[in-house]
Swiss-Prot record:
The gene is rpoB. The keyword Cell membrane does not apply. One of its GO terms (cellular component) is DNA-directed RNA polymerase complex. GO terms for molecular function: DNA binding; DNA-directed RNA polymerase activity; ribonucleoside binding. It comes from Pseudomonas putida (strain GB-1). This is DNA-directed RNA polymerase subunit beta. The keyword Transmembrane helix does not apply. PANTHER family: DNA-DIRECTED RNA POLYMERASE I SUBUNIT 2.
């Protein structure tokens, strides 16, 4: 295999046994693809596909005026260029968006002509607001903050059949229901009641008999009965009654008389139940007619009206029960034929017939009125209104849309073959649904499982944005319709008709404040990726936390390979917010698909198919780990498979598909946990969630024991710098990398230079630090998509969330009681868990009623010492070390004029004392914060003079840009001349540049000429002259382009900033705070093993081994067995082996062994002990030495989930590293030097420091603010609150009898207002007595009792 630039420097020993059939797909594809579909930015007008914006426009346009004389048509749209790039948007706090311009055509028809002749056509581009753009990492910058739109998992449109699980009625009878859910529009429900009548609800309103809906659709009673029932035909001749026999229908009945065949042989005796055998005999005998007694008809229901043959009088309506009287009437009238409905109690119930009997309506109009009354209670119904309302409910494309998905699901469910069709319902659709529902009630067919992933689909960003956009357009449509009638008379243009505000507002609201538009979790690269791959069942049109039951939250068999069964939050959202599995993707309908390998006759092919949950149901799917031989045949007699959502075993020839990879079940975060297969699921859940909270450490350290997914996450997260094209590194420093692109990758007419600017010390959403460091050196060769610079939490292009710590599992002096963690001081000294946090502090100068606030260094009543870190503009220097209470930005606010005494006025007049009418409102460092100022940004309103600091910052930025552009030009020029040099070398000159004709060009000749003179050369070959001219023109164009770019940037920098109304100036100060690890910080491993640092011990006191190597961390062994996360123990053992091998390599390097010996040892490490084979032969000796140097600190290993290292392999690794195979060693107590009585498990575990730092949580209150009503101190760090002395604490003091302490707690320390002020004065005077008064709570209590109308007073003695 070919190794990338970083892989060559450090190969991970991989223990996986299964071949990689398919690479893990790009992890952010779900976001990027969806939004790309929505915008269709690159498409030309004729090539727009009917999705996204285009579809939204087409669904609303054309808009036709009420009179029908004018219409507004949609032609196409185009997206402009963004005003600022992403970084500028973040800095300025604006949205990264592009203007949307829509071309519309206004058509005015001639009123006079009969055939709508066109009178006038106007076409114009109309501005329709801004559309936010997605950055290349799948985020949006909205008002300067990075946000993510989370995908939503909602119920797919279509028709669903369900029952109430016997909960509605006390008898426990199952009441079946059907629900037609459209993409937008009214819901239609059919449901059975306990009496087995069918009812309909529209939009969950009052129920009506279902027959009302059928009548409203224009069906008569007879048609309804014909549709739902078959009929029995009786012939009457005189006193005799005979039935046209269909033998199947008699099954299960009791014979009321003997049944004979034509010869007179008795087939069924009277009183016997008719069985399947009898029916077979009847069919064989060919009995067509059956004479029955007259009573046989009684109780049956007529299928058609019975009419008097002579007079035409209706004797009985259809759907009437046959009674004795009716029979006598019929016999008298000499009716010869009666049709009755065929019903029975087993598989053909009389439900629709019964429903028709309770229905009060008798014709279509009455039915429409009944529906109108239900939808609009209290409004008087008219025929037109009722018809319009009913038509708009389900049959109007403007109000109702099933969508392509809905139609597909609908047709599949009711058994049609075609999957396309209209977006609105038809009569037939409604009847088919009712038929299916009745069939299910009759025991044919089953209800749907609503949690099946075939019935839930994913709505991604693009689709949700399109829906919002459509909502905005519909609002515009109403306004446009009204204005269109004026357009014809007043000659308006399209621009005058369309007001873009509602569209812009809808889009802004969606991106800014929708429940699914979330502030990006930017703790580390993994949390970013996970956030973008999240699928939520909450949000608009989804579930709510309170309503969601257990079933929705549970793991469903169809989640396999689509949604991760492990990664979900703990707490109220458990199971509602999920993560996509590693290989999952959505199909065109939004259903999640998982990849499988095709298996034919027991032979596994490399063809891959993606299947949704519906499509995979009938397949027999083998595990990825099923045993195969070299010919890829399944060799086990019985293979473990999944079939019909069950786990079972089948013969190899029955298998049709096979999993692609063992990690296709889990999400990205879970696939980063080594030995996941040995952890309990609950702890694995905590492990995946805690990796997302890891704070990037100062120096990232790759995990010694990983899973091989680290590289994918780091590459796809976008925090690393990835080469766009291959080439040679031209120059590299801390802030930029310049690549000279390979000739074969250069497009014609461009420079072939890629410049990558690195992000330095920037604040993330979670205040962690984003910083990139180059990995490459000048002259290195890189290929396309190699990683050239590490970002936060990445080490050589691999995700590195924590540090490898030497740990021992042992109870030690009680310091690690109950999950506490004991650390060595060495961890702090080496800055292993030191993190940098960047805080943004903002100072806003506003225009107040009393005058403008001013940012200045001239602050009243502040000593010189407090101002020594400010410049003349009153803003702190970059690089200043500041602590709590220091002034960062000096600001004064005008104070209201106070009434002055005449003496003061006189003094004012004499001394010109102005300082007293302003108050100090400077920005100070918040309490408990200490750090370094790393950056200052000043934003000034247009028209306000900029201060010296703002000008200095602007000059610095301009210099930076100029330097960048000059550098770019220098490289472009260099590259161009290099190419010319290789083309001209050895060619003959025709003259020019002071050279004689016939001179042959060599390097010396060219070095003797200045670059400008090269273009004066006339060569003998015309092609070369042309190349010279092109090169000259290219350089001139490039210079012009760069100058334009500079001017553009300069203009942007110099224009005023768009600030909120009333704001004159904003100063942002960025503080970098360094946090070392300390007691109280939360740490965790990757297996859900979390704890709090309890103590940091001196190195010399820590337990150490026989060589004197102390351990870094002591963990409690009692935390392992009950929690069943044994993965951490295996990780510890393998980590020890990895470290041991590294030390062995280090010794070999120190002894200056030859490269050949190193090669032999490395081959042994990588290829002798199981797992994937590495090809070390393609490495040169230098590369082998470089590799060995990078392995000194430990050989990194990969044990992929469900396909990892086996116990024997771990033992073999330990043996190879000359370490005990048990993974245990004898330790000595650092304090006493005594040996511990039994060997202890020692090894290396990857530990994370989580973003729950004691510095952010702990605070102390002196005197602070009080609650207005109760006068008690507030709570919480943000309010500078106190600790609540609660009910139980009061009981504790009562139990001790500590009366005075209790009195102090409940009075002067809480809400005795006078007492606490006195106390304060007393303490200041050095007098420590207290005089408790009445707590304010009593007054509150009295007021509450008075509010109940009881007058109560406290008597004072």
């Amino acid at each position: 295999m070919a190794y990338s630039y970083t892989e060559k420097k450090r190969i991970r020993k991989d223990f996986s046994k299964l071949p990689d059939v398919m690479d893990v797909p790009y992890l952010l594809a779900i976001q990027l693809d969806s939004y790309r579909e929505f915008l269709q930015a690159g498409a030309s007008k004729d090539h727009f596909r009917d999705v996204g914006l285009h579809a939204a426009f087409k669904s609303v346009f054309p808009i036709i005026s009420y009179s029908g004389n004018a219409a507004l048509e949609y032609v196409g749209y185009r997206l402009g260029e963004p005003a600022f790039d992403v970084k500028e948007c973040v800095l300025r706090g604006v949205t990264f968006a592009v203007p949307l311009r829509v071309k519309v055509r206004l058509i005015i028809f001639d009123k006079e002509s009969s055939n709508k002749a066109i009178k006038d056509i106007k076409e114009q581009e109309v501005y329709m607001g801004e559309i936010p753009l997605m950055t290349e990492n799948g985020t949006f910058v909205i008002n300067g903050t990075e946000r993510v739109i989370v995908s939503q998992l909602h119920r797919s449109p279509g028709v669903f059949f369900d029952h109430d699980r016997g909960k509605t009625h006390s008898s426990g009878k199952l009441l079946y229901s059907a629900r037609i859910i459209p993409y937008r529009g009214s819901w239609l429900d059919f449901e059975f009641d306990p009496k087995d009548c069918v009812f309909v609800r529209i939009d969950r309103r009052r129920k009506l008999p279902a027959s009302v809906l059928l009548r409203a659709l224009g069906y008569s009673t007879e048609e309804v009965l014909n549709t739902f029932y078959t009929t029995n035909v009786f012939h009457i001749s005189g006193e005799k009654l005979s039935l046209e026999l269909v033998p199947q229908r008699l099954r299960g009945e009791v014979a009321v008389m003997d049944i004979h065949d034509e010869t007179g042989k008795v087939i069924v005796e009277q009183g016997r139940r008719i069985t399947a055998r009898h029916i077979n005999q009847l069919e064989k005998a060919g009995v067509k007619q059956l004479d029955v007694p007259m009573e046989y008809v009684l109780g049956r229901t007529t299928a058609k009206a019975i009419v008097h043959p002579a007079t035409g009088e209706i004797l009985a309506e259809c759907n009437t029960e046959m009674t004795t009287e009716l029979l006598i009437k019929v016999a008298k009238a000499q009716v010869v034929r009666i049709e009755t409905l065929y019903t029975n109690d087993i598989d053909c119930g009389p439900f629709i017939s019964d429903t028709l009997k309770i229905d009060t309506t008798s014709n279509q109009l009455e039915a429409l009125v009944e529906i109108y009354r239900m939808m609009r209670p209290g409004e008087p119904p008219t025929k037109d209104a009722a018809e319009t309302l009913f038509n708009n409910l389900f049959f109007s494309a403007e109000r109702y849309d099933l969508s392509a998905v809905g139609r597909m699901k609908f047709n599949r469910r009711i058994g049609r073959t075609e999957i396309e069709g209209s977006g609105v319902l038809s009569k037939e659709d409604i009847v088919e649904v009712l038929k299916t529902l009745v069939d299910i009630r009759n025991g044919k067919g089953i209800v749907d499982d609503i949690d099946h992933l075939g019935n839930r689909r994913v709505r991604c960003v693009g689709e949700m944005a399109e829906n919002q956009f459509r909502v905005g357009l519909v609002r515009v449509e109403r306004a446009v319709k009204e204005r269109l009638s004026m357009a014809e008379s007043e000659g308006l243009m399209p621009q005058d008709l369309i007001n873009a505000k509602p569209v812009a507002a809808a889009v802004k609201e969606f991106f800014g404040s929708s429940q699914l538009s979330q502030f990006m979790d930017q703790n580390n690269p993994l949390s970013e990726i996970t956030h973008k791959r999240r699928v939520s069942a909450l949000g608009p049109g989804g579930l709510t936390r309170e309503r969601a039951g257990f079933e929705v939250r549970d793991v469903h068999p169809t989640h396999y390979g689509r949604v991760c069964p492990i990664e979900t939050p703990e707490g109220p959202n458990i199971g509602l917010i999920n993560s996509l599995a590693a290989y999952a993707r959505t199909n065109q309908y939004g259903f999640l698909e998982s990849p499988y390998r095709v298996v034919k006759e027991g032979v596994v092919s490399d063809d891959i198919v993606f299947l949704s949950a519906i499509e995979e149901a009938d397949h027999v799917i083998a595990q990825a780990s099923a045993a195969m031989n070299e010919k890829k045949q399944l060799i086990d007699e019985l293979v473990a498979v999944r079939h019909l959502n069950e786990f079972t075993v089948k013969a190899p020839e029955d298998v049709t598909l096979m999993d692609v990879s063992p990690k296709q079940v889990v999400s990205v975060a879970a696939s980063l946990i080594p030995f996941l297969e040995h952890d309990d699921a609950n702890r694995a859940l905590m492990g995946s969630n805690m990796q997302r909270q890891a704070v990037p450490t100062l120096r990232a350290d790759k995990p010694l024991v990983g899973t091989g997914m680290e590289r994918n996450v780091a590459r796809d997260s976008g925090v690393c710098v990835v080469a766009r094209r291959g080439g040679v590194i031209d120059s590299v420093d801390a802030s930029r990398i310049v690549v000279r692109v390979n000739d074969d990758e250069v497009e014609t007419g461009e420079a072939g230079v890629d410049i990558y600017n690195l992000t330095k010390y920037t604040r993330s959403n979670q205040n962690t630090c984003i910083n990139q460091r180059p990995l490459v050196s000048k002259g290195d060769k890189v290929q396309r998509s190699d990683i050239m610079a590490d970002g936060p939490s990445t080490d050589m292009g691999e995700l590195a969330l924590g540090q490898n710590m030497r740990i021992a599992f042992m109870a030690w002096n009680g310091f690690n009681f109950e999950d506490s963690i004991c650390l060595s001081e060495r961890v702090v000294q080496e800055d292993r868990f030191t993190t940098i946090h960047i805080q943004e502090l903002t100072c806003v100068a506003r225009d107040t009623k009393l005058g403008p606030e001013e940012i200045t260094a001239d602050i009243p009543n502040v000593g010189e010492a407090a101002l020594n870190k400010l410049d003349e503009a009153g803003i702190v220097y970059v690089g200043a070390e500041v602590g709590a209470g220091d002034i960062l930005v000096g600001k004064v606010t005008p104070k209201g004029e106070t009434q002055l005494t005449p003496e003061e006025k006189l003094l004012r007049a004499i001394f010109g004392e102005k300082a007293s009418d302003v108050k100090d409102t400077s920005l100070r460092v918040p309490t408990g914060t200490k750090g370094t100022v790393i950056d200052v940004q000043v934003f000034t309103r247009d028209g306000v003079e900029r201060d010296s600091r703002a000008l200095a910052i602007e000059k610095m930025q301009l210099d930076e840009i100029r330097k960048d552009l000059n550098e770019e030009f220098r490289i472009v020029e260099g590259a161009t001349f290099e190419r010319l040099r290789s083309a001209l070398n050895g060619q003959v000159v025709d003259g020019g540049a002071g050279l004689k004709k016939g001179t042959v060009i060599t390097d010396e000749v060219l070095d003797g000429l200045e670059h400008g003179q090269w273009f004066k050369l006339r060569m003998a070959e015309d092609a070369l002259n042309e190349q010279l001219e092109k090169a000259q023109q290219y350089i001139v164009d490039r210079r012009r382009l760069l100058d334009d770019k500079f001017e553009d940037k300069k203009r942007k920098l110099q224009q005023g900033d768009d600030l909120a109304p009333g704001v004159l100036k904003i100063v942002k100060v960025y503080l970098a705070i360094r946090r070392r690890i300390q007691p109280g910080d939360k740490m965790a491993g990757r297996h859900g093993n979390k704890g709090v640092v309890s103590v940091i011990m001196p190195v010399e006191d820590m337990p150490h081994d026989a060589n004197g190597t102390p351990v870094d961390v002591v963990l409690n062994p009692l935390g392992v067995p009950s929690r069943m996360n044994v993965g951490q123990i295996l990780e510890t053992h393998l980590g020890l082996a990895a470290k041991g091998l590294g030390e062995k390599i280090d010794r070999m390097l120190e002894e200056q062994r030859k490269a050949a010996e190193l090669r032999v040892f490395l081959t042994e490490v990588y290829n002798e002990i199981g797992g994937r084979q590495e090809n070390l032969d393609e490495f040169t000796d230098e590369e082998i030495l470089a590799l060995a140097n990078n392995l000194k600190k430990g050989v990194p290993m990969a044990t992929p989930v469900f396909d990892g290292a086996k116990e024997r392999e771990i033992k073999a690794m330990l043996k190879l590293a000359d370490l005990p195979e048990s993974g245990q060693m004898v330790l000595f107590d650092g304090r006493t030097g005594n040996k511990f009585e039994r060997p202890v498990t020692v090894g290396y575990m990857y530990m994370l420091k989580l973003n729950h730092l004691v510095d952010d949580k702990m605070h102390a209150r002196s005197t602070g603010s009080y609650s207005l009503v109760t006068q008690q101190p507030l709570g919480g760090k943000a309010q500078f609150g106190g600790q609540r002395f609660g009910e139980m604490e009061v009981w504790a003091l009562e139990a001790y009898g500590a009366a005075y302490t209790l009195q102090e707690m409940l009075t002067v320390k809480s809400d005795d207002v006078n007492g606490r002020t006195k106390m304060y004065k007393n303490i200041v005077d050095g007098d420590h007595r207290m005089e408790p008064g009445m707590p304010e709570s009593f007054n509150v209590l009295i007021k509450e009792i008075r509010s109940l109308g009881i007058d109560i007073d406290l008597e004072t003695e």
